[in-house]
């Protein structure tokens, strides 16, 4: 944590030093210098890059997703019996992604809110766009080309819904190659709502609102299940029915700023308790979900899973030196987590019930997924992120010049 905070404040400190060097060459009164110090303060360079174990957890999550789609590699009775349980490990993987997203985004927003007293919404949305849109729309364009050539089955409604990040609310959504975008839709819809709420409500009220939503979310799911039967197949795919999973991560980020809460939760993280959570997450929850479906997931299943993953996330962040933490922070594991977004996007054309490319060999399929994801990361994601950083730096320099001109 300390390393993360030092890195997050190093850029502002450097910019502040540069500002002081500029100001020191100009004769000014004490009042004027004080005014300049306020006006010229650069934007904080915020990052969550060095939070330990998160990339490793992303890697575990994407492994669960790929494994849940790999039922075709099994044969006969093994395939029929294992598919139902493995399918829910894909749900588990996505749930971990949701909790991590809520935690990371809130952590980033809180650091800006604490540093500047506000949240630059335009800046936040631009940064999210550079992070998410390039790889997503390249994948969507690729599917569009294949669809026009008759190589994949797709509908116009599903394609438009994916393009507008509303696939998860389109009741007639179809087509395997876009069947995984529902989780990306939830995250994008969440990104639109949560920063606005946090800016309006502030940290304390925002936490209270998040907890209230978590408490009423099971009721919302039950009502949706009972009174919107056409959307029952999307019960776990809509923002209003899964927002509590993201909010568990948000609440953890806010509460982690309270030393007394951190101390209490650290005491709770006893090996026996953590072992029980792992048994529940990896064994009990998938079996109950497979056995009872929405009757378990809607009133209690998603809530228990989100809460359990949040505590395990807290443990992984707080104890990176533990055996689990050391594994999660191994370079190959972390790298898989870094490219997990591209893996998630492109695995759909190689893996699952209707893959575009069916190799018949699981090892070759995994290799193709990794090679495609690496290409997507280095050719699409990294250049977009470099461009985003250059624009950030240019914006910072422009802001500094404008503020100096005010003097």
Task: Report the location of each language-model feature.
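Function-critical hydrophobic alpha-helical transmembrane segments in multi-pass membrane proteins
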Residues: 174-198
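Alpha-helical transmembrane segments in multi-pass integral membrane proteins
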Residues: 11-12, 23, 27, 35-53, ...
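Alpha-helical transmembrane segments of multi-pass membrane proteins
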Residues: 122, 126-139, 198
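Residues within membrane-spanning alpha-helices of integral membrane proteins
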Residues: 55, 59-62, 101, 133-140, ...
């Amino acid at each position: 944590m300390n390393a993360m905070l030092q890195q997050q404040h190093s850029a502002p400190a450097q910019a502040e030093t540069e500002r002081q060097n500029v100001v020191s060459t100009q004769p000014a009164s004490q009042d004027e210098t004080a005014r300049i110090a306020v006006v010229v303060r650069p934007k904080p360079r915020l990052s969550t890059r060095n939070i330990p174990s998160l990339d490793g957890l992303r890697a575990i999550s994407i492994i669960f997703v790929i494994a849940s789609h790999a039922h075709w590699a099994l044969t006969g009775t093994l395939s029929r019996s294992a598919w139902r349980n493995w399918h829910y490990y894909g749900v588990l993987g996505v749930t971990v992604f949701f909790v991590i997203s809520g935690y990371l985004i809130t952590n980033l927003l809180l650091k800006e809110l604490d540093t500047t007293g506000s949240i630059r919404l335009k800046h936040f949305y631009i940064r999210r766009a550079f992070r998410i849109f390039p790889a997503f729309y390249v994948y969507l364009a690729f599917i569009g080309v294949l669809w026009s050539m008759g190589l994949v089955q797709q509908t116009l409604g599903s394609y438009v819904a994916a393009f507008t990040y509303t696939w998860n609310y389109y009741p007639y959504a179809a087509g395997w190659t876009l069947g995984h975008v529902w989780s990306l839709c939830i995250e994008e819809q969440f990104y639109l709502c949560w920063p606005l709420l946090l800016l309006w409500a502030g940290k304390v009220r925002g936490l209270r609102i998040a907890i209230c939503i978590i408490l009423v979310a099971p009721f919302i799911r039950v009502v949706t299940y009972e009174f919107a039967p056409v959307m029952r197949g999307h019960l776990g795919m809509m923002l209003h029915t899964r927002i509590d999973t993201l909010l568990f991560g948000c609440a953890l980020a806010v509460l982690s700023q309270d030393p007394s809460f951190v101390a209490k939760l650290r005491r709770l993280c006893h090996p026996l308790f953590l072992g029980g959570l792992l048994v529940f997450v990896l064994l009990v929850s998938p079996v109950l979900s497979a056995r009872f479906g929405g009757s378990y997931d809607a009133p209690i299943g998603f809530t228990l899973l989100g809460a359990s993953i949040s505590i395990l996330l807290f443990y992984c962040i707080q104890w990176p030196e533990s055996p689990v933490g050391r594994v999660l922070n191994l370079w190959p594991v972390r790298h898989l987590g870094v490219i997990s977004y591209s893996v998630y996007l492109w695995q759909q054309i190689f893996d699952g019930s209707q893959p575009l490319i069916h190799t018949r060999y699981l090892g070759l399929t995994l290799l193709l997924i990794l090679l495609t994801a690496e290409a997507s990361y280095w050719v699409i994601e990294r250049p977009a992120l470099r461009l985003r950083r250059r624009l950030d730096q240019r914006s910072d320099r422009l802001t500094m010049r404008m503020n100096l001109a005010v003097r």
